[in-house]
């Protein structure tokens, strides 16, 4: 079981029935790196090399520091196992804040991404003053498109961002 370290950025902790959405810790990186270096990361800019995976991991921590939001580490409540990330990001090339999720292969199809996305959406509505909240999904990412629709998002537009076609779903 991972030992949790001090939460220097005062990142809120969200609990659901089966999950804990917690701040990133150093030991998360090795597991995240496996995902980011795999073909499964193709919809989030991968596959990455090790240094780029580290930059992605650190950029998330920077998000928390600069904006007060970012990706939570997604953990199973019963055993504290790290199974993915979910949260709000705002890359410079996006016009709206983005509800994003990544669940690792062995945990897909179990409802974890849905449970976490609903929790983050609810937290965001009650704790941030965003005028809109979107999910920017690369065309062809059928699993994420399906999840966005289940979470209650409606397709609003398509846009080319950084030479990729994104389908942008909106909640607010």
Where are these regions (language model features)?
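Acyl-donor (CoA/ACP) binding surface of acyl/acetyltransferases
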Residues: 1-43, 58-62, 71-172
